[in-house]
């Protein structure tokens, strides 16, 4: 009987499997120009039991994979902040692990003449408004993120830039002309062993003041200075530019994988990663990987 089992294992018929928990965050959107909307956070997908995915969703199921098989691995870069009047912040790039794809965060809108935020993993914020306009925030992807904020200029005739949506919450509507809108909140995960917040939306560009940002989101600019970038490898949105200033770049994404320490991961040449071991598991944090990169286990 044992010889039969060994033969089946050698033939790959009874090949062992491994269960992998993951946190996959996409690159975030860049902020808009000139009282621009904040960039939306990168899409957020998590399988750690008891934690949350983006968009208010519960944790997803872990993946069951085969050893000695290559699986796709990509870490999405953040989108560039807008540098010209009327130019929308660029959306980020998707992050991928095997069958899991997190959607890029949407770029923030720009004023003159004013534009809506871009749809994405989390949506970008609408730009500042004039002439009683309403510039809406972009929508977020279901189970990955929330919508960007809307700038409503119909109340007092003008509005500042609204914040980008976060993985953990939508950005609020802005109805005044001084302080830029708050970025949406992100989500915390302890997949690495300590709790870290990621996936915050970028703050909206203001006219003398800026709103709050958390979890890697970049602050909007209150004046003529360039807005802050989202934090690298958090999927935090770029801040919106203030009066005649540029938007900040979106933060790059990240892929974090937790698996039994009986297995060793092998990464293709374009991957930048670090691996720690403890409690019977290994945790690999991948901070850079191109569209053709892979990971396998043995």
Indicate residue ranges for each PLM-predicted region.
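Low-complexity, glycine/proline-biased repetitive segments and flexible coils/loops
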Residues: 2-10, 18-298
